[in-house]
């Protein structure tokens, strides 16, 4: 309910901003309405399609195999652990998958809390103790229980819409001035070449700025998932798991998957563009109890 309220309030704020832009620039509302519809369709369409296909795409990207029937003691333990933690978190048991990778990693995805997927790497199963692995699984279960995948989709849809809409509004203004076309009868976009070039550049720039917002939220939700894991299995187990990650291989999963994994890539120009907070910050947050309620 809180996610939907946040979504509606955000979009109300977006509409207020759009109204101010129209009032200040005097752009014809008819063209803006069409542009807004297009921005909403493209902005949210791509995000929701990705969400609906997330389980399939995730499994394909890592070559994961869903466990239909446990074949050995490790798979039995994994299924039992996920089932137990799901009951504790109050969600339906997700599908469980294993994928072959040397790095210690796991991820959760899915369009709904009760139709989700948890996948773990063979590197995690081979290199972590049972206590550490339990903590990682609890971290992913917490992502599902918190509804992080849906919330990320809503946020991504809003920022996508902003990027598309604002970049084209500004491109329309720039094309009108730079093209010297002030005659409304010749079209609202001015010189089409200038309009296209400016729109592409602005989309690139605004897209980079928008990624800072989505990455901030991604880092923020990692702290809460760590706290959720601590509540499910104990703080010390989660701290031990994060300390183990500090000695693991650099993750090999595709960049598009990093926001869903417990272990993000550490090589980044700035923490602002990282999907995960530095491991030391996550450990310190657990020790201080900052996100544990």
Curated annotation (Swiss-Prot):
Names of required cofactors: Zn(2+)
Residues reported to bind Zn(2+): 139, 143, 222
GO biological process: proteolysis
InterPro entries: HtpX_protease (IPR050083), Pept_M48_protease_HtpX (IPR022919), Peptidase_M48 (IPR001915)
Name of a matching Pfam family: Peptidase_M48
This protein's UniProt keywords: Cell inner membrane, Cell membrane, Hydrolase, Membrane, Metal-binding, Metalloprotease, Protease, Transmembrane, Transmembrane helix, Zinc
Subcellular location: Cell inner membrane
Transmembrane portions of the chain: 4-24, 34-54, 158-178, 193-213
UniProt cofactor note: Binds 1 zinc ion per subunit.
Membrane topology: Multi-pass membrane protein
GO cellular component: plasma membrane
MF terms (GO), sorted A to Z: metalloendopeptidase activity; zinc ion binding
Major subcellular location class: membrane
The family this protein is said to belong to: Belongs to the peptidase M48B family.
NCBIfam families assigned: PRK05457.1 (NF003965)
The protein's name in its UniProt record: Protease HtpX
Protein's organism: Enterobacter sp. (strain 638)
């Amino acid at each position: 309910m809180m996610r939907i309220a946040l979504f509606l309030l955000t979009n109300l704020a977006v509409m207020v901003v759009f109204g101010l832009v129209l009032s200040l620039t005097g752009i014809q509302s008819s063209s803006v309405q069409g542009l807004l519809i297009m921005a909403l369709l493209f902005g949210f369409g791509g995000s929701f399609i990705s969400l609906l296909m997330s389980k399939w795409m995730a499994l394909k990207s890592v070559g994961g195999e869903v466990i239909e029937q446990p074949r050995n003691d490790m798979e039995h333990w994994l299924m039992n652990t996920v089932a137990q933690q799901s009951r504790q978190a109050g969600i339906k048991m997700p599908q469980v998958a294993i994928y072959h990778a040397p790095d210690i990693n796991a991820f959760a995805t899915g369009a709904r809390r009760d139709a989700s997927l948890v996948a773990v790497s063979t590197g995690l199963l081979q290199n972590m103790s049972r206590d550490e692995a339990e903590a990682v699984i609890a971290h992913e279960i917490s992502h599902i229980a918190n509804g992080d995948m849906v919330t990320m989709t809503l946020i991504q849809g809003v920022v996508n819409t902003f990027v598309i809409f604002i970049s084209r509004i500004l491109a329309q203004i720039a094309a009108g001035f730079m093209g010297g076309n002030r005659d409304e009868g010749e079209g609202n976009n001015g010189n089409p070449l200038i309009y296209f070039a400016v729109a592409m550049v602005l989309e690139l720039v605004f897209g980079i700025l928008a990624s800072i917002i989505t990455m901030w939220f991604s880092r923020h939700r990692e702290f809460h998932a760590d706290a959720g894991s601590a509540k499910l299995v104990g703080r010390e187990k989660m701290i031990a798991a994060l300390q183990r990650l500090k000695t693991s291989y650099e993750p090999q999963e595709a960049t598009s998957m990093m926001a869903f994994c417990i272990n993000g890539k550490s090589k980044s120009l700035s923490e602002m563009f990282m999907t995960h907070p530095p491991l030391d910050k996550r450990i310190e947050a657990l020790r201080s109890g900052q996100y544990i309620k």
